[in-house]
């Protein structure tokens, strides 16, 4: 594939082979991430004389298929972006007038969003590399739109699929790959290129490639700022100073003087005289013009010449001619002639470039002078006291005359410029005529020399060997010239071949992508038509049911009502089946059998429970679609990741608020991994690379006391999740590996029931090693010591802290529980131990985990209180302990609105200081330790008394008693 050197394939193991691979290669590191497409390019920007190429740092974002550009690699916010998904590319062919051996142009065009952006690479090879890489990225992104399911809840952003077990679901394609022939043709048309030093992340450490116009842009910008500052002094109401003047420096010593009041009076008098003979002096402009352009012999050195002179001195410092006035010419003699010729050629090119820049600057000066003339003249005619008392028609006539004068002046200047250009063209043509005459003379001499050689050969035939032509003969010149022309034509031919290959590949790709887009549109139309038909069918059935409900009910005759209800129930309990995926668009289902996390949405056994679960799933779907219509959260995440394209993620209030609102499904793997790495960086720095593989190898070689309990709990972890439902599931093997590795890392805990559920949730979005470090984060960083030990000391302490917080934040509900003697910590104990796994619906569970992995265990207290506050009124209506306790066992599954729950957790419960939780933990820790010590003493006394009791005897059988 083109540009394969810049991309690395993602590795990833799955199933049982992953464990064996990790065991066989304990030193193997994690899979390498694909290399980013980034580097320096020059972008054509600006307007007018300031238009030119500016060096920019470009970074490709595969999530949105955007090509962002920055001023430098260190910038956090991009200057803009190009949408590559709907872009097409082109570049110009070789220049036929170019000299043979010269470097062809390396600029190309990106046509996107109705605009054309011109980019320039340092050389032709890098231009080809960028074009093929951008083509490849566009191809992968657009084809990935076909590789995901149409349900938006199961469709991560193309190019940014999550990792972990949920990533495996994205490989279930609705369509087979439709572009096999197009892919084969693309490979044939591809041109192998190798990235240079200015591509890739290593290019950020190198200086940006410069271009000769950089100093001119800077000088023009500075010059424009000075002009703007000088113009700001032209405000009415200020006193006139005759010595004040505005000077424009060009290559000629022109000076722009402000008009004095005397000049204005003279101009008004002259205009009044011209009113009598308006046609008399139509072409005369000098007498009435309020500005004086004159030579200023006393002016010092001009700033523009200083800039150009310093630029020449910097670039011609190696010129030997600048050293030779002292009489020692040894330096220039020692230099080779080729080097001297190259220097002279480069200086000539710089001189031509400077001449072009000088002409553009002169044009800018002319436009600015004309603008200043017009503005100042209008100012004096509108605000000057000299115009007081002058009739209105006279002033209008003066304005008309002034406009005529300005127009004639502009026309005169334009004609002058045209005259200069024509004169320059005449001079160029004369020089070309001279060159052609020289070539004609040389050809005549060559023909004459050939005639002489032919005559000599004919005269001396048979008398001896033919005379050889000297190498310096004029006949060699046409041969060399023909050879150069042949080389140039060969270069052009090769360039046209490459361009033809590229354009053919571009046309092929655009045609294939267009066909894919048309097919997606047809499928979506079919899906929406089917949904509309199903909606009409359901509405019809409900209208029939409502009509039947109006009729009197007969106890003996069931009537058609029961049949309609039975049919509606049967239709409602249907779920999406994966046996016939080709009919997914023909018969769409609103609720699938599994959600995006792999949890079963509808149970298999109880029909009544199935109906309740189906209603809950439909409510969740409705909430999700409603939230999706408000795209503010998704847009905020996209904007945040756009600002981090050029830098690493960092903790900030903005990121905290985004995570609290919930991480989108397509970004959760990336953000979770970043959170885990941030909390475990100190552990990883103190361990050898491949720490997880080493522990896993040890667990496979040696027997661990915890391994038996781990095996017993594997299938009991998340039986309602398809990734852990059977022994052959991929998640079971990964879960075993992580738990065994952790049991060897932390022998004090080994294994505790509850750790398996923590790892199972982490594995849904993380790979094995990252899930291992996630467990380390929870057990060794977030939770207090002895949280998962045999005594569960830390867990018991947190329940007492939570009881204190309940009495403070929810006093009515706490008093209600105390009144009916309901110990709600029996319910909340499991919430804290496994961080709400199997306690809330999956959408809310993962939003809780988002904040938990970023902020720590304080989030558990927030959400536990928020769950009770969410249903506070319903709980207060219950008036007996049995109904309260029964409601507490399932009420969390009835909470579906994650946005409301998050608002309660991080809004209504504030303030929520972490220091308060730490102080109460320390207070209750001593009390619980004292109670456990007393219980242990009582237990030891009981065992001691039982062992030393004289009444203790050996048990005998009934037969022995009979005998």
From Swiss-Prot:
GO biological process, one term: endocytosis
Subcellular localization: Early endosome
Coiled coil (residue ranges): 337-535
Domain Rab-GAP TBC: 662-856
Keyword list, A-Z: Coiled coil, Disease variant, Endosome, GTPase activation, Phosphoprotein
Superkingdom: Eukaryota
Ranges of residues in domain PH: 34-139
MF terms in GO: GTPase activator activity
Phosphoserine modifications at: 155, 317, 473, 957
Keyword Coiled coil annotated: yes
Region of interest: Disordered: 1-30, 272-348
Protein name as it appears in the record: TBC1 domain family member 2B
Native source organism of the sequence: Homo sapiens (Human)
Lineage, highest ranks first: Eukaryota, Metazoa, Chordata, Craniata, Vertebrata
